[in-house]
Each structure stands twice: as C-alpha cells, then as structure tokens.
Amino acid sequence: MLKKFVLGGMTALVLAACGGEGGSASSSAPAQSANASGSLIERINNKGTITVGTEGTYAPFTYHDKDGKLTGYDVEVTRAVAEKLGVKVEFKETQWDSMMAGLKAGRFDVVANQVGLTSPERQATFDKSEPYSWSGAVLVARNDSNIKSIDDIKGVKTAQSLTSNYGEKAKAAGAELVPVDGLAQSLTLIEQKRADATLNDELAVLDYLKKNPNAGVKIV
C-alpha cells in the first residue's frame, strides 16, 4: 500500500531573497519577493545568462539521458524560462547538500531541483517562483522489511541527504541518519543492507522503481 506523507512539495524555482538569512526552495520561475525578483531579472538580463544549480542525478526532475544530455522536468522548465527571458541558460551540477549554500553565496541565480521550502529558516532566506508541480513524500524499505510507516523508523538507519526536507523529517521521527549524496545512493544502501529505509519524493522513487524493477525495495 503506497502511503504518502504531508511532507509533499510544490515544485518551483528558488532564488536567494534580498537581505534575508534563512531558506526555502522549489523549482520554477522567481516570484515571491517583488524586490528580489526584480533585481534578479535585471541581473540576469545584464549578464545575458541565467545560472542554475541542479543535481543532474535526480530523475525525473534533473538527470542525464542515454546520450549524456542534461534533461528532466525541472531542467526543461528552466530552459523554457530562459527562452522566455531571451537569455542563455548555464547549469551548474552540484550535490544537494551544497546546493542552497551555493545559492546563498551567489554561485547560482536560481536552483531547479524539486526543492521544497518548508522550514522557517529556508522561507526566511530564499524566495521561490510560482509552483508548477506537486508531489508527495513516500517511505521506502527493502522488500522483506517489517517497516510499515514512518512511526517505525525510530532508531532505524535511514539514508538521507542531511540538509533536505526529507532528512529533517526522518530525524524528527527519531531515525539514525546515514548521509548520502542523493536518492540513488540511498536506495543502493538499502539494497546492500547498509541502511534500512529512506524518505523521498514519490515521483522520483516511482521513476527509479520503473527503471529498476528488480531493485529489491518497495514503497511501504
């Protein structure tokens, strides 16, 4: 039985807020603070390029196709935004745990990576565009696992990106966090019995299971 959690996410593009010091993210075109959006658009137009932080390893949102081309839903939305603005787009592939720090430091203009701005800290630090997709969170464990709900992960090794919303949720549930770079590594560690579960985006997990039907893991 597929169980979704309230920790879902509306996807939008995320940008650093003007003068803020906390954070929040999504994946589409900037539109929360008029001042932040206006100054960002002006800067992008002056450069002629929008610089985008993304993982490149998080299908179906940001990944490389069989020819090695960076693609995915968030990537293509960002390309459409750049085309609308009449500027070029430059993607900088970055591990998730460095993504928001990179945005705050000015390495990117926006982040496009299925980001959820749910924590008060992120909401204070970052702005986001209008949402363009919605996805819930699911818990994944091995096929032979007795884990049935998030209540069962207290004290359990749970593979998570430490700075993600999912990592925060797992920690709050009492899980023992096993640091990873992304979803694929999380699921590999579960298969190898080096971790017992992971909490992550429903669409990303379903995409992985479709491509890896013999993975030995399930949504609980």
Regions found by a protein language model. Name each.
Residues 14-17:
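C-terminal motif of bacterial Sec signal peptides marking the signal peptidase cleavage site
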Residues 91-101, 162-164, 178-192:
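Short helix-initiation/N-cap motifs at beta->coil->alpha
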Residues 79, 88-152:
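Acidic, polar ligand-binding/catalytic clefts
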Residues 125-133, 178, 214-220:
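Short beta-strand->loop
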Residues 31-114:
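Extracytoplasmic small-molecule ligand-binding "clamshell" domains
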Residues 115-123, 169-172, 196-220:
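A ligand-binding cleft/hinge motif common to bilobed small-molecule-binding domains
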Residues 19-22:
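Bacterial signal peptide processing site
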Residues 57-59, 70-83, 135-185, 202-207:
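Bilobed "Venus flytrap"/periplasmic-binding protein-like clamshell domains
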